[in-house]
A protein has these predicted regions:
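A short SAM/SAH-binding and catalytic strip from SAM-dependent methyltransferases
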Residues: 25-37
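GHKL-family ATP-binding catalytic core of two-component histidine kinases
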Residues: 18-20, 37, 107
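Active-site micro-motifs of SAM-dependent methyltransferase domains
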Residues: 16, 34, 64
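A short acidic, Gly/Pro-enriched loop at the edge of an enzyme's catalytic core
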Residues: 12-27
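SAM cofactor-binding core of SAM-dependent methyltransferases
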Residues: 1
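S-adenosyl-L-methionine-dependent methyltransferase catalytic module, highlighting the catalytic core
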Residues: 6-11, 40-148
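Residues marking the start of alpha-helices
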Residues: 13-15, 32, 102
Length: 148
């Protein structure tokens, strides 16, 4: 499913990558998973390609006061989008006029969903730093580890 663009940039479907099983030590994803309709499949695929003890580091909008992940939209088997809430679009530097649909807003239940996908441990890391001039809201990173 993966390919390399004419600019040398690798593109993969996070729900069905072309990487071999247990071939990567670390997978990182930054502000992508909220745009993936079947994010649970992306979790399972990431676990598949990680070596035992490998780490999955990712960021996405995370609602720390929200227990459950909220589905904003879904897709049918034919790819048709069904909106469950008012559509929310995030900025897209490649298509600034269009934006990218947000399918979900993650809550604390995502830690259980990562476990269901095969990760042994997962934590939410809140980072704020005066010395590094990260003075706004905390940066929220989720770290999951595949069992050894």
């Amino acid at each position: 499913s993966g390919y390399v663009s004419h600019r040398g940039i690798r593109h993969e479907d996070v729900t069905a990558t072309s990487f071999a099983s247990a071939s990567l030590d670390v997978v990182m994803s930054f502000d992508v998973l909220e745009h993936v309709p079947r994010y649970e499949a992306a979790f399972a695929e990431t676990c598949r390609v990680l070596r035992p003890g490998g780490h999955f580091l990712w960021t996405a909008p995370f609602r720390r006061n929200q227990e459950k992940t909220i589905k904003r939209a879904t897709t049918t088997e034919t790819g048709e989008i069904t909106h469950l809430l008012t559509p929310q679009y995030h900025g897209d530097p490649l298509r600034p006029d269009a934006g990218v649909l947000c399918f979900q807003e993650f809550g604390w239940s995502v830690l259980d969903e990562l476990k269901e996908a095969g990760f042994e441990k997962s934590v939410v890391v809140l980072t704020w730093s005066w010395s590094n001039v990260n003075l706004g809201p905390e940066l929220i990173t989720i770290r999951a580890q595949k069992s050894l």
